[in-house]
Amino acid sequence: MSNKVLVKWAVILVALFASVYLLYPVYKWYSLSNEDRAKLEASGDRPKNILNLGLDLRGGSSLLLELDVTKLPDNTPAARNDAVSRAIEIIRNRIDQYGVAETPITRQGEKWISVQLPGIANPAQAEALIGKTAMLEFRIVKPQTSALDKAAAKIEDTEEPWDEDGNLIPSLAKLLPADTIVLKNKEGGFSFLEKEVKVTGADLENAQVNVGGDYGYPEVSFTFSAEGAKKFGSLTGSNIGKQLAIVLDNTVQSAPSIQSRITRDGRISGRFTMDEARRLAITLRAGALPAPVKIIEKRTIGPSLGEDSIKSGVRASLYGIVIILILMAIYYKSGGIISNIALILNLVFLLAAMAAFNATLTMPGIAGIILSLAMAIDANVLILERMREEKLRGRSLYEMIDLGYTKAWSAIFDSNFTSWIVALFLFQFGSGPVKGFAVTLTLGLLIGVFTSVFVTRAIYDLLLTANPKDISL
């Protein structure tokens, strides 16, 4: 056996062992019951490199969010683009900390964001977590004056003093001094605050939930960064004796009196439930959204529908593959069996590659896999037909195989290359499901060329070392 043949088989065996290594955790994971997988996911013990199931296969919720770009300080196209990109990263950080792994989050158009939550048990909590702007501000409460007393009386006498965004209506806002704003209190009523904000949630380093706050309610403690500690120390040190309002999303959570200069730590107390406190801590750690977001579309897919999709997709795929394997073996005999071996390896290598990239398998992804397998079969058919032609011309066994691959290569390359170009455009301009199709198709085409050309040729080279008289085609 030549060194060239040995190298080819070494490459194939390394790829095969690597695929088995990558697919074994996937097999173990999906051998577990749904309850066991849910427990492992909740405890954070979910394996990292496994083949994830998408929303259409696993069930869950799909949300379409709209970023309110009109609330951006700078509403230029560049600023809007940056705001959407930052919002995607912040939402991803929030969901990751909430415990939902590998959530597909993609941009849709100029100001929309698609979020898929496969397998999540309580989508309402995740929706509240995603939609919360989490704009944390620290403002000094204005001391009581006759002008503010008059403004307060006017606000209380007005039936609808607030607009739909929770801001004071313009006719009442103009009654306030230039350096003053008024915001609602969480427990009812409103507070007059300084308009200037000197410390925000961007200055925080960490936030966590503590039990044992006021009246036994959970509270959120926070720690400032080094720069934030300087700002907060300056703010509290120069306003001892005044009230400091802790404002979250334009609502005053509490307004404790400043007893001394505070630098590093603080806490937000209120009548939080444990879930509310946990979500607040997560949003503060992940950062504030650059602008408010609202959920404009929500779709829910039940787990049973996802299981039906899996069964239907797997069944259809297996039926199609088995029929192709049988037809190839009948029509091309030994050549068909060699092609079938390459096709099976193609599927194994493709699934292993997807597991290595921690990809998410969806129904469009399954369609991409099937199409790539069809392209691989087409490549094998081209090779076998060219080999048949050379055999009819009386070529020797080696010449038949060599010329068959040489003459078929240009057609194989052209068909796969044009498909790669299409897949590239689909990935660049398509939405989430279309991108999933494009990714699996691209991987499948690359692996298909490897198995159809490299693997099958290695098998023929191995057969030639035994000096056979003929290979049935």
UniProtKB/Swiss-Prot annotation:
The keyword Protease does not apply. The keyword Cell membrane applies. The chain crosses the membrane at residues 5-25, 316-336, 337-357, 364-384, 409-429, 436-456. Belongs to the SecD/SecF family. SecD subfamily. Part of the Sec protein translocase complex. Interacts with the SecYEG preprotein conducting channel. SecDF uses the proton motive force (PMF) to complete protein translocation after the ATP-dependent function of SecA. Keywords: Cell inner membrane, Cell membrane, Membrane, Protein transport, Translocation, Transmembrane, Transmembrane helix, Transport. It is a multi-pass membrane protein. One of its GO terms (biological process) is protein targeting. It is found in: Cell inner membrane. GO terms for cellular component: plasma membrane. This is Protein translocase subunit SecD. Forms a complex with SecF. Part of the essential Sec protein translocation apparatus which comprises SecA, SecYEG and auxiliary proteins SecDF. Other proteins may also be involved. Coiled coil: none annotated. It holds the Pfam family SecDF_P1_head. GO terms for molecular function: protein-transporting ATPase activity.
